[in-house]
């Protein structure tokens, strides 16, 4: 979407969510249009392989091919942005860590919208928040992520990216609703980054729900304006 064919154009690689088995929803395509306007960016959203027919390995191979190709089309990796929501947020952060291991350039920014950060779902606080979350349940999510993991342990960074090497990644922006199952892990993750001295932006969606920026509510526009300040004008 919005490809000007220019090497200095900001480029977003968007990794959509969907519990590792769903293709993008209409909300995703609407959100891409908003990202184009807010960031004046070219946006690419691959429909990656999913469970039950594939696991994470096939998707990481696809994303690596796409990312390497993007690196040849832009002047500066700083102009690359990886965004992921929900399961896509998990994939986005894990993929950035894999890029580091493969000694490939980091994107300028990594934006995580209600990401799955710990696939073991062992945080006891998560059960309390689950009672208020109409969208995401722990037991069902754990069953699906086990299929996605294949033979990888659930505590491996590719499944639980908060367990990985977080140094030297692109600038992380994290948003999550305070009324969702994943909120406690997001808070824990932000504290971890602070403890490591890693600059990042943590934007809680107060009294909001899972992947709230994908829905037509006022807070969506507010988050887009914050993203623009972080990525485009660099005011935050």
Predicted regions and their residues:
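Alpha/beta-hydrolase superfamily serine-hydrolase fold, recognizing
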Residues: 5-236
